[in-house]
């Protein structure tokens, strides 16, 4: 029932604190950061997520223009990089997200009406792996999160993956 429209979904990660250790001689380094991550999963516009006790259920709606499931987290990425970070480098690592908020938002055709549901039963800890190809201050990355987004038995089995562009 959770029909995610992948190419309309958006993820934004902002690392507020960042630290790096790098060996010029061995061309290897380690990066760690702390920041915020915002995931906005676009779902079918004729569905709204609602809680039935602790269970997340889809409900059919009419007149929906856009329906989203949003997760806001404290984001802690860690990567080991090989190569020259000022030119070309490759990094692999992982991340840990501590979920602060989750909600469902529906925007209807008549623009002014919105419906919100906060506090969906998501797992507090979410973790994943990252691979990144960096060209100076620009990078192409992919992430996969094998941990479930919803608590066991409270929603659909759902992992996320992301392909994106990074700056700095």
Where would I find each of the regions flagged by the language model?
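Early exported N-terminus immediately downstream of N-terminal targeting peptides
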Residues: 25-49
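Short loop/turn motifs that connect adjacent beta-strands in outer-membrane beta-barrel proteins
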Residues: 21-29, 84-87
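Detector for outer-membrane/organellar transmembrane beta-barrel domains
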Residues: 62-101
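Surface-exposed strand-loop-strand hairpins of Gram-negative outer-membrane beta-barrel proteins
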Residues: 1-15, 150-152
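Transmembrane beta-strands of outer-membrane beta-barrel pores
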Residues: 20, 34-42, 96-102, 137-139, ...
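Predominantly the C-terminal beta-signal and adjacent terminal strand-loop region
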Residues: 115-168
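Transmembrane beta-strands of outer-membrane beta-barrel proteins
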Residues: 28-34, 74-76, 88-94, 129-131, ...
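Extracellular/periplasm-exposed beta-strand and loop segments of Gram-negative cell-envelope proteins
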Residues: 1-7, 41-71, 99-110, 114-130
């Amino acid at each position: 029932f959770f029909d995610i429209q992948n190419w309309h979904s958006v993820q934004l990660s902002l690392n507020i604190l960042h630290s790096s250790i790098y060996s010029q001689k061995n061309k290897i380094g380690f990066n760690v950061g702390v920041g915020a991550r915002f995931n906005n999963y676009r779902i079918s516009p004729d569905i709204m997520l609602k809680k039935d006790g602790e269970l997340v259920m889809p409900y059919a709606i009419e007149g929906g223009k856009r329906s989203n499931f949003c997760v806001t987290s404290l984001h802690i990425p860690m990567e080991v990089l090989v190569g020259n970070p000022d030119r070309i480098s490759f990094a692999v690592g992982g991340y840990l997200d501590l979920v602060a908020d989750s909600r469902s938002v529906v925007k209807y055709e008549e623009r002014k009406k919105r419906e919100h549901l906060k506090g969906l039963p998501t797992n507090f800890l979410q973790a994943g792996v990252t691979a990144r190809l960096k060209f100076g201050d620009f990078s192409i990355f992919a992430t996969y999160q094998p941990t479930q987004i919803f608590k066991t038995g409270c929603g659909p089995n759902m992992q996320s993956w992301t392909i994106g562009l990074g700056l700095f």
